Curated annotation (Swiss-Prot):
PROSITE patterns associated with the record: CLP_PROTEASE_HIS, CLP_PROTEASE_SER
Active site: S98, H123
Species assigned in the record: Clostridium botulinum (strain Alaska E43 / Type E3)
HAMAP family the record matches: ClpP (MF_00444)
Name this polypeptide is given: ATP-dependent Clp protease proteolytic subunit
Lineage: Bacteria, Bacillati, Bacillota, Clostridia, Eubacteriales
Function: Cleaves peptides in various proteins in a process that requires ATP hydrolysis. Has a chymotrypsin-like activity. Plays a major role in the degradation of misfolded proteins.
CDD domains, A to Z: S14_ClpP_2 (cd07017)
């Protein structure tokens, strides 16, 4: 069981307490921490849609500290980020690996950030299947299509040639924040909130 801190806000009308994540949501900040799965995806998609309905012209920030997870859950978040009107800024705190790195790179161009000690890792999709040979072949073909699709999007996000992406995701490819900036996964390494120090 995890402990979620409460914060108290005082206004002229009295006090109101929020859990910390609700208070951050009020500031248009979404946290993606831990595994990307159906539950976290549904929560983030709902928050993105809610924030768009509140103000379609104001940016939304997603702070990412995730080892990755489900491709379909991650693609639901990705598609919603592209679908909504507000720009979605992405910030890596800690680690963005696998689907976490994919989502980090999918933020609005010019608004993708990493903190100085963040670590980013890209690799090809993982899959483990068992059953009849024909079923295994169906799943293998599906994962190859997914790999091709993810590589094309990563190529667009980073401005790296598709062949470079294909080679670089063959194995786990770990990068520092500065290396991720040079690669095109993020636009800036920031040390201060706001405009930050451009590295």
């Amino acid at each position: 069981m995890s402990l979620v801190p409460m914060v108290v806000e005082q206004t002229s009308r009295g006090e109101r307490s929020y859990d910390i994540f609700s208070r951050l949501l009020k500031e248009r900040i979404i946290m993606l921490s831990g595994e990307v799965n159906d539950d976290s995806s549904n929560l983030i998609v709902s928050q993105l849609l809610f924030l768009e309905s509140e103000d379609p012209d104001k940016d939304i920030s997603i702070y990412i500290n995730s080892p990755g997870g489900s491709i379909t859950a991650g693609m639901a978040i990705y598609d919603t980020m592209q679908y909504i009107k507000p720009d979605v800024s992405t910030i890596c705190v800690g680690m963005a690996a696998s689907m976490g790195a994919f989502l980090l790179s999918s933020g609005a161009k010019g608004k993708r950030y990493a903190l100085p000690n963040a670590e980013i890792m890209i690799h090809q999709p993982l899959g483990g299947f068992q059953g009849q040979a024909t079923d295994i072949q169906i799943h293998a073909n599906r994962i190859l299509k997914i790999k091709e699709s993810l590589n094309k999007i990563l190529s667009e996000n980073t401005n790296q040639p598709l062949e470079v992406i294909e080679a670089d995701v063959e194995r786990d490819n770990f990068m520092t924040a500065d290396e991720a900036k040079a690669y095109g996964l993020v636009d800036k390494v920031i040390t201060k909130n706001g405009t930050g120090k451009d590295k």
